């Protein structure tokens, strides 16, 4: 299934010069969403890791079914001050500003799939899909 046709592109959102990839059109289509999760599951099944990390907020949508499919724990990477226990923070820059992600310190000593390893396993036609998450 060509998943890119289920993702809407919105120019100049949330500000001028940004091309926003709207995944709501993918997740509202049960067949496309299932196919997307199944494709990601196949890719992740080939990698060595301990947990699935869901990055707020789009990542939560995909990490939960992936965690279930692959029988792996799901850890949350959240915006600053959203996690209740002791946290580790990382600041980074986006196309339109700065942000901070946090993870519970007791989740740090785990192997999670890196973006580079996942991208190497994705076929060319769906590579842009992964970049939306």
Which role fits each region the language model picked out?
Residues 1-133:
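PRPP-associated nucleotide enzymes
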């Amino acid at each position: 299934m060509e998943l890119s046709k289920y993702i809407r592109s919105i120019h100049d959102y949330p500000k001028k010069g940004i091309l926003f990839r709207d995944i709501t059109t993918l997740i509202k289509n049960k067949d496309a969403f299932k196919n997307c999760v199944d494709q990601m599951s196949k890719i992740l099944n080939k990698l060595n890791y301990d947990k699935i990390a869901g990055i707020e907020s789009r990542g939560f949508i995909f990490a939960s079914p992936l965690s279930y499919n692959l029988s792996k724990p799901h850890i949350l990477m959240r915006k600053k001050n959203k996690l209740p226990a002791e946290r580790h923070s990382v600041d980074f820059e986006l196309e339109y500003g700065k942000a901070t992600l946090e993870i519970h310190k007791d989740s740090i000593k785990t192997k999670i799939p890196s973006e580079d390893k996942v991208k190497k396993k994705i076929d060319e036609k769906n590579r842009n899909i992964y970049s939306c998450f």
